[in-house]
Amino acid sequence: MSEDRELQALLRLTAWLSPAFPIGSFAYSGGLERAVADGLVTDAASLANWIGTLIGHGSVWNDAVLLTESHRRQAEAPGLAEIAALAEALAGSRERHQETMLLGEAFLLAARAWPDEVFERLPGKTAYPIAVGAVAGAHGIGPEKVLAVFLHAYASQAVSSGIRLGVAGQKDGVAVLAGLEEQIAGTARRAAASTLDDLGSATVQADIASLRHETQTTRLFRS
């Protein structure tokens, strides 16, 4: 990739996965709010552990694998439809399904500012990692770069949620992000070489928290 293309890729990833991109990710905690209410996440250290575990072994890892496969299949409408259906099926709760589908829909709507035929190949309703992977692949951005920024965006949003929930301050939140850098980079490299055989998670408490959040009466977040 030429220097100009490298800069273009960086700018597009920064735009697409920025908190300012209009997809509404700030409204979701992915079960973190319930984990805080249940005393599973109480401070910056446990917040970092929660985020890191999901990235390495939970739903975020599965999202990274799905993103990679979508990136590979971006030129094939049937292949995208198949992986999109799998992504929906892997959503472990009603709120998790709602989150990934609404984020995916909003991402595709906003990303049309960068026209490409990939939008016609994707299903009308598409899970978030499928949308990101296909669009990035269609624009010639390498999977490892996409994954690194995608995972960092997740971590940043989760830290922001933790700050809003009162388990960490802003200074602690920045330290959490800094501490996760090595894991994010390693997971991006691992996911870039993954296949669907690598799907799987071992984060039962996080899955239960996502389910329990559905009946939580007082809340800040939609998931």
Swiss-Prot record:
Keywords: Chaperone, Cytoplasm, Nickel insertion
A Pfam family of this chain: UreF
Coiled-coil residue windows: none
Subcellular location(s) per record: Cytoplasm
InterPro entries attached to this UniProt entry: UreF, UreF_sf
PANTHER family per the UniProt record, alphabetical: UREASE ACCESSORY PROTEIN F
Its job: Required for maturation of urease via the functional incorporation of the urease nickel metallocenter.
Subunit structure: UreD, UreF and UreG form a complex that acts as a GTP-hydrolysis-dependent molecular chaperone, activating the urease apoprotein by helping to assemble the nickel containing metallocenter of UreC. The UreE protein probably delivers the nickel.
UniProt name for this protein: Urease accessory protein UreF
Source organism of the structure: Rhizobium etli (strain ATCC 51251 / DSM 11541 / JCM 21823 / NBRC 15573 / CFN 42)
